């Protein structure tokens, strides 16, 4: 069973980030994904006057996950992060993880690329009908 949960302590966040090969950022909030109780992924994010910012979305390193576990972990965690950002009253978000290699996943979560090359999503009413915002999940 897939679970996406907020990381409760900075010590835990640092350890999870290390397992996922991303830099621990003390100013970030974070979620982690688990499948059947096993850690699969992390998402670090912030919010500021510009909007929400997903800084890292990464799988645990050196573990072979099924496509299903990988796709579901990243997609559900990305959407959960956007939902939290929206519930906090921040209605735009940016995907800022330059090391993430899955453009299809970024689009599926709901982001589109601006003319300036930034991944952006307008969260106004996004979760009224979230399925309309996916751009087709394609395996990279």
What is each stretch, according to the model?
Residues 1-25, 130-140:
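Short amphipathic alpha-helix that is part of the acyltransferase structural core
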Residues 32-46, 94-140:
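Terminal substrate-recognition subdomain of acyl/acetyltransferases
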Residues 52-117:
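Acyl-donor binding region in acyl/amide transferases
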Residues 2, 28, 110-112:
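Short glycine-aromatic motifs
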Residues 1-4, 17, 38-41, 77, ...:
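Generic preference for well-ordered secondary structure
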Residues 4-10, 18-20, 27-35, 67-72, ...:
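Short linear motifs at secondary-structure transitions and domain/linker junctions
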Residues 19-60:
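A conserved beta-strand-loop-helix scaffold within acyl/acetyltransferase catalytic domains
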């Amino acid at each position: 069973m897939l679970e996406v949960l907020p990381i409760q302590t900075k010590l835990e966040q640092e350890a999870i980030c290390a397992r996922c090969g991303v830099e621990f950022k003390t100013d970030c909030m974070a979620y982690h994904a688990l499948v059947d109780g096993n850690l699969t992924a992390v998402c670090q994010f912030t919010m500021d006057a510009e909007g929400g910012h997903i800084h890292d979305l990464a799988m645990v390193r050196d573990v072979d996950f099924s496509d299903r576990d990988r796709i579901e972990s990243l997609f559900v965690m990305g959407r959960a992060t956007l939902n939290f950002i929206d519930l906090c009253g921040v209605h735009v978000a940016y995907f800022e993880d330059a090391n993430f290699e899955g453009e299809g996943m970024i689009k599926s979560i709901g982001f589109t690329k601006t003319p300036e090359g930034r991944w952006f999503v307008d969260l106004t009413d996004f979760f009224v009908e979230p399925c309309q915002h996916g751009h087709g999940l394609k395996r990279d």
